[in-house]
Amino acid sequence: AAAGGGRDREGAPCLYATMSQQADNFFVLQIDPKTGATRQFSVDVPESNYTTAVYMGRDGRLYIGAAHSGHLFCFDPAADGLLDLGQINGDAAIFPCRIDEDGKGRLWIGSYGTADLSSYDLRTREFVRYGRMDETDMYNYPLVNADGTVACFIAQTLLHVVVFDPQTERRQTV
């Protein structure tokens, strides 16, 4: 589960919590901090059981990567619901490990399965898939640097960092 602060459709402060479960898909709780009242939102995409990566965007939307469907979802307060933004990277991304945002309004998503890296442009609503960041390991946890490069923390067999430059698409192990 993950939690964070945000706004509801009326612009009032609220809390968001994601809840994972084995028997069904994940859901999001919207919590009124004054009254404790909750509202629950679910997704319909099969095998979206776990919220393995959650990010509160600068746009006030909650972005959620789901295992085992490998889909990116968005809780949009204005739409008052969960939106399916699509599959992150087919079978290469069984579940996302981490989501971060750059200064250009792109979400960077590292996934388990192939330690792949994908971006999702919030303006154009399109994914770009950059492939594996490591040929052996399977987990990728990206962090966007101030200069726009993406530091991919690669795990589990041999912990290391691969720096990816989106401008040149060059990868460098550091």
Predicted regions and their residues:
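Conserved beta-propeller blade signature
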Residues: 14-18, 61-64, 106-109, 150-153
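Short loop/turn segments that connect beta-strands within beta-propeller blades
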Residues: 32-36, 76-80, 121-125, 165-169
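A short loop-to-beta-strand structural motif that recurs across blades of beta-propeller domains
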Residues: 27-29, 71-73, 116-118, 160-162
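Beta-strand-rich domains and repeat architectures in extracellular enzymes and scaffolds
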Residues: 1-26
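Short loop/turn segments immediately following the C-termini of beta-strands
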Residues: 20-22, 67, 112, 155-157
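Repeated scaffold domains used in trafficking and secretory/extracellular systems
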Residues: 1-7, 48-55, 93-99, 137-144
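Fold-core signature of tandem repeat domains
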Residues: 62, 75, 82-85, 107, ...
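Surface loop/turn motifs at the tips and blade-to-blade linkers of beta-strand repeat domains
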Residues: 42-47, 86-91, 130-135, 174
